[in-house]
């Protein structure tokens, strides 16, 4: 039988620092939307970088989001953390610089947000968005 237990605060922070990929959940008008997402964790806040599109429209309409991060060795050995909070679009220079430094450290190529798709069909650059999630609720589970 598989035994699952709560993760400590420290274990959750370690997992968020060790990983850089999760699933961002948001909702608009009662419709959920979940997307894979690269992120960075600075020990306090989570940051993510994306191009304008469906997820930014959902977040602009309802900034309450959750980020689920996992580490799976096999079906019997895994850890998972769920972070709930508000996504705040960053616009202040100092905040943007701090967030981008954290993100580039974890994901130097900024993929997949920066790719060939950052140009529209007319060759114009697509707008980008940078967000911070301040964790309000954090839960974690692991197998033992």
Which positions does each model-derived feature cover?
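Amphipathic alpha-helical interface surfaces
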Residues: 12, 55-58, 95-99
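Charged, gly/pro-rich active-site loop segments
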Residues: 2, 75-144
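Helix-adjacent hinge/juxtasegments
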Residues: 48, 54-81
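Short beta-strand segments
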Residues: 19-51, 67-68
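Short secondary-structure boundary/capping segments
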Residues: 13, 38, 56-57, 73, ...
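Structural motif corresponding to alpha-helix initiation and N-cap regions
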Residues: 9, 52-53
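Extreme N-terminal tail/first-helix region
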Residues: 1-18
């Amino acid at each position: 039988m598989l035994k699952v237990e709560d993760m400590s605060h420290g274990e959750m922070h370690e997992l968020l620092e060790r990983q850089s990929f999760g699933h961002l959940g948001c909702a608009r008008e009662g419709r959920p939307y979940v997307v894979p997402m690269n992120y960075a964790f600075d020990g306090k806040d989570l940051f993510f970088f994306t191009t304008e599109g469906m997820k930014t429209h959902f977040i602009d309409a309802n900034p309450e989001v959750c980020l689920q991060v996992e580490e799976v060795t096999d079906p019997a050995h895994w850890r998972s953390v769920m972070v709930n909070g508000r996504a705040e679009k960053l616009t202040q220079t100092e905040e943007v610089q701090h967030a981008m430094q954290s993100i580039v450290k974890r994901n130097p190529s900024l993929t997949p947000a920066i790719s060939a798709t950052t140009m529209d069909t007319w060759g114009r650059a697509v707008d980008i968005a940078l967000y911070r999630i301040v964790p309000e609720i954090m839960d974690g589970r692991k197998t033992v």
